Amino acid sequence: MATINPPAGNASAVQTLRDAVRSNEEIHLARGTWIIDDQIDMAGICGKITADVEAIIRLPQNTKREGFLLRNLSKPLVFEPKKVVSETTFKGQEAPFYIINQGNVTIRGADISGIQYGHAISVRNTKDGDECKFVTIANCKIQARQVDERVNADERTTAIAVNGTLEFETGYSSPNRQYVALHKPPRVVKPISYPIITNNDITGGYYAIELSGVHGGHITYNWMKLNTRGLSMQNSSVSNQVRYNNVIDNISAAIHCAYGAVGNIIEFNNIESTRAEGEGLLQAYVGSTGNIFRGNRVSCNTEGDTRPKYMLYCAVDSGSNVFEANYLNGSAKNALIGVESDWSNTINLAYHRSYRASNDDNNMAGDHMRAVSICRNVFRDGTPYRAILLSSVNGKKLSDIYCYGNVIPSGLTNDFIGKENISQVFNVQGF
């Protein structure tokens, strides 16, 4: 192993590191400050990078991207930095660690702070690039700028972003706009497969962990705090396993599936929030089918009109989802459980998701919705006086809603919108 010293006088360390990874199979970053004022292409023969406990990697203020560009590696790479401080406010920043078209990379034990734009760790595929498989992000501590729904999309930060390559229909570049018009999610032409994201401590960011076009991932034992959204699985993310995570004081969805997320397992996670709002804390919507939400523990102490609309939520072309044995303590504004076939702001009922909403999401559904199971869940609060809401609007029928064994506080009632278009409902009082 070669021990490399940082340049004297806070000079740029970019060339020093470029040379080191090309000539050494293992390198160790000595104590001191490592100034990274450009993107470093880390292609070379190096297979392991470690750092002294007093080695600080610093990304200074800049007008261009900075960080480690991990691609075209000759062998698997394990990168174990200690402290990484980002000071840049460049809006085009990607990430201190940018993995693109590259598999078999491990980022472990990094303490990353100061993320103002972009991501802390970004994993991407391009359509014509190499397969990106078996990336591991473990034991990292990440701090990103806190943002909310009102921040423009290009200013939202994400702690860990994993994005496969999507292909949209001609004329569309947004999953939401394509689904409204065509009722189909984007196609994944190059997924990112089998990532492992485990035991990370994440504070802030619009998303703590964002999965888009990801297949077969394992997301476990992470702490996500003060995020707008904790964990998002979108854009045809398939067969991911999300277990034993903690989502604390999120604003919007804690864990959600959307736009073609299929066959994901979300179980044994802990969610606690005193500031949650939005649709629901656990949710599958907009073309998300066959997902299982099981054994999760959810506590929401938000009060008044800022409460989330639902605790569990399933809507819009999202059949065959299972909500089983979840423990939910707290209240929601509209109903504890919401199952809705479509959205329409013409429905003049405050407990419908799109009540007084914009026209943007009207008529989102492309088909009828069926086969939602809500079984053996435990609810521990008496508000909002509505336990289960079943809603059929815009002629999109709702059927085969199977409920059994739920423990619901006494005094709660169930409610229905478009009851004439709802059928095959089992064990829902009042139907």
Question: Which ranges hold each PLM region?
Answer:
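Right-handed parallel beta-helix/beta-solenoid
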Residues: 1-16, 33
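Extracellular parallel beta-helix/beta-solenoid repeat domains
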Residues: 15-28, 32-431
